[in-house]
């Protein structure tokens, strides 16, 4: 079956990407097979493998000639049948990943874009000694766990447990970054329409691999949270807002840390020509001259970026021996509704750690999973996840743009439903 799947991949790939040479096609095929072997949701891959198996037989050419394969994939994506749309979306997403990434380094597609190419680097995992007990276990070292560990560390003995590793202080390529600093190699997707779910993994969590965008939660959203949770002015209270003030001050969140790079000058001009106002996005950096964040999502080290690791887990603020990297929390032991132990996997060995208190801040994907695996039962667990999908838009310009250069998101605007862009730059 694997040989037939590979045969179908080569036929479809050559039709969708006719300019790729043989070596580039082979690299893409290797990564495609890597996805098939490592995709978290096996049920999502089964349908695709069956279709590819059937597609490999010669009878297919009677109905779908090679030259018509691109149109066939487009028709799948726009089909009225949800199963076919799902198949078309899945094929497009996985083929796209196969061109953007490579097991040998940078994806083949970037050779055509004058894109900076970086070789695979290495991660040196630290040996950690898992304790028998800890007063407070904070699970997750990102924006939630980082704040919690920082505050609680003033009063309690805090152990920080993180699924990922420390950063390597290198500028990494895309494949290496996704494989080492994101959960499930950065290939996990939603069912149905294949929205890629990128969950940061490593000391600092998402704060170590994001673009440093630091937007405060708007008042209207805080009011919505109060309404949804039945709270009486909790999220919109002065106390809650002072907590945000504290975090923003500690991380040095400021619009002065952002500058409009060449790639967004045209966007700013277009907004101005259409009488649309825009604002500069504040960033959490300690140096206004830190203006390169194109590779920060792949673990690029920059001491100016104020991740939770830099701000709150430095040796002068947090006991380094209480930071347990590369530890996977399997579940919690419960007694009378209270967590008494956490079950921690490290280097293939399962450890049971006694705890007085647990702060579970493993992200919106893993937090409910750990609760479910621990025996918690609630109709909302594992449901009601809301995403804000991001879509890329490409433009052709007379001048070279280098979209990976400079800070990434620089400005934002509120475009209402009745407003349209009328004038061209």
Segments the model singles out, each with a brief description of its role:
Residues 414-425:
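Single conserved hydrophobic/aromatic residue that forms the stacking wall/gate
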Residues 164-169, 174, 202, 345-350, ...:
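Glycine-rich loop(s) and the adjacent beta-strand/alpha-helix scaffold that form part
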Residues 338-342:
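Short, hydrophobic/aromatic-rich segments at coil-to-beta transitions
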Residues 93-125, 233-331:
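Conserved redox-cofactor binding core of oxidoreductases
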Residues 130-133:
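Short helix-loop-beta connector
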Residues 177-256:
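Redox-cofactor-proximal catalytic regions of oxidoreductases
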Residues 2-101:
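Flexible, low-complexity segments enriched for small/polar residues
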Residues 135-159:
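N-terminal Rossmann-like FAD-binding beta1-loop-alpha1 element of flavoenzymes
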């Amino acid at each position: 079956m694997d040989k037939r799947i590979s045969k179908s991949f080569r036929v479809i790939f050559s039709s969708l990407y006719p300019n790729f040479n043989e070596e580039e096609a082979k690299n893409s095929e290797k990564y495609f097979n890597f996805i098939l072997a490592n995709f978290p949701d096996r049920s999502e891959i089964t349908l695709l493998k069956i279709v590819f198996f059937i597609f490999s037989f010669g009878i297919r050419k009677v109905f779908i000639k090679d030259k018509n394969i691109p149109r066939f994939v487009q028709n799948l994506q726009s089909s009225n049948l949800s199963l076919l749309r799902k198949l078309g979306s899945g094929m497009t997403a996985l083929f796209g990943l196969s061109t953007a990434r490579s097991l040998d380094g940078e994806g083949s597609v970037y050779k055509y874009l004058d894109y900076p190419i970086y070789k695979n680097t290495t991660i040196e995992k630290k040996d950690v000694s898992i304790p028998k007990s800890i007063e407070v276990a904070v699970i997750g070292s990102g924006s939630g766990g980082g704040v919690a560990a920082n505050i609680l560390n003033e009063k309690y003995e805090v152990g920080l447990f993180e699924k990922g590793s420390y950063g390597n202080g290198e500028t990494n390529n895309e494949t290496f970054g996704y494989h080492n600093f994101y959960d499930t190699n950065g290939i996990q997707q939603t069912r149905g329409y294949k929205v890629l779910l990128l969950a940061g993994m490593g000391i600092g969590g998402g704060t170590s691999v994001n673009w440093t965008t630091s937007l405060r939660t708007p008042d209207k959203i805080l009011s919505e949270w109060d309404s949804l949770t039945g709270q009486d002015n909790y999220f919109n209270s002065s106390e809650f807002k002072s907590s945000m003030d504290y975090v923003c001050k500690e991380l040095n969140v400021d619009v002065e840390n952002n500058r409009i790079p060449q790639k967004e000058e045209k966007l700013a001009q277009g907004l101005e020509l259409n009488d649309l106002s825009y604002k500069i996005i504040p960033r959490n950096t300690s140096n206004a001259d830190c203006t390169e964040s194109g590779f920060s999502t792949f673990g690029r080290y920059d001491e100016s970026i104020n991740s939770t690791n830099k701000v709150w887990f430095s040796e002068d603020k947090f006991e380094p021996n209480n930071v347990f990297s590369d530890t996977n929390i399997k579940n919690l032991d419960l007694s009378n509704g209270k967590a008494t132990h956490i079950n921690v996997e490290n280097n293939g060995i399962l450890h049971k750690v006694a705890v007085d208190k647990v702060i579970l801040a493993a992200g919106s994907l893993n937090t409910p999973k750990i609760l479910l695996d621990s025996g918690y039962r609630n109709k909302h667990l594992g449901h009601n996840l809301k995403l804000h999908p991001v879509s890329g838009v490409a433009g052709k310009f007379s001048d070279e743009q280098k979209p990976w250069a400079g800070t990434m998101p620089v400005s934002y605007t509120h475009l209402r439903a009745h407003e349209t862009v009328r004038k061209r730059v």
